[in-house]
């Protein structure tokens, strides 16, 4: 299940308040799982192997790393919204570093694009610094065959490229002043459209190392939709395997 930042803070409050016995805390960056296990004591190794067996490699090799509250009676995993930079372990429930992580005020670029509509914005934490949204007509698909279909396809392809060019131009204009400071760029819309747009936009290609793997769910790009993206960006995946009786 997906938790908002606020809901995740409430979960951390509950964990802190109850201080469940024999629950260890693990924070593991991407690509560090095997080494993290090697560096563990026998008790931690047992818990970490159990996590791997119960959650699977898809979780332990997450693109943003893994946070775990794990013991004999408590088994909770978190997939954070942004990459974990530092590994740590505690033989008790420890939420301070996670809270600091969630309170970061990242500078984030957002591009929402579907065929016909777009929205581009810059956020510092939850605050929007600059944005632009709009539309550009793109014909729907043509079901008939023959010459008319080919002509229609050429027109549609041209319109799509014109949309991509416009969105790329706006993205470049809005994000260039923040280029060196940007922490991440998130994109939202249909995966196929996003991939094709990314291939045609030099600015996006130059920022490849800043592009987040996760695609933001977007119904229809607009300023209103853009303003809702921080809550989506900061959502964490929570997997509750066991919750102790309180």
Protein language model features and the residues they cover:
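Terminal alpha-helical anchor/extension segments at protein ends
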Residues: 1-246
